[in-house]
């Protein structure tokens, strides 16, 4: 069952094209990664899904309801964490958490206290005194303490240290085990690779790749290092081998995943002494699409 469904979303801001035909589908109990650099269209897509802005073209629904016309009804079942959290400066962190949780009709004080402890947050301090990381913690505690069916997280670990990132990841997996759905927008590829069932990569307002992590890994290459007692003739002519480099009798190269089995059989004929391989990573695919664009 599709919890989120977006079809052919288009959005312009003046002459700037923010979205150009975005399709997205997130199913029940799924963690869906939405990745791309800043300015690629992630936040614009999320704002359309939340009914904050209206798409110029296309359709978006959550729980089968229209994202724009039924936004109030949808929000009763959604927890949202933005990447840049702004809080009421005269309230304490604990007061803000209580406000958000009560607005959602939840009142699980044990869950609230457990999350405050996990995220190492002092809820008695005024929000004006919080660092960016602590403001992010307030938003995360408020979201995870709510009894939502869908969690939309836009760059949620921005400002968190590695230890708190791990706590965040544990909380996300806890939610998934409860059968809830999560849309995770991020540019931290290791985080997405660790957590997500499916991924979409967005670039300049267009989805350029989408699928499960296994499906996407087949689109990129395996790194391999070998050492043989016999010289391998014409290795650069072998189908599926790329970017050969040699240093201290060690050959390193890239291998097309679909050719991996045949390549191993071929090089094994030359008295292998050493073979190391590193499987394809999401980062490899991401960088293949973005290299040359001035970074991410």
Please provide the spans of the model-predicted regions.
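Extreme N-terminus of proteins, especially the signal/transit-peptide cleavage junction
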Residues: 1-2, 219
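Structural motif detector for alpha-helix initiation sites
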Residues: 28, 93, 213, 279-282
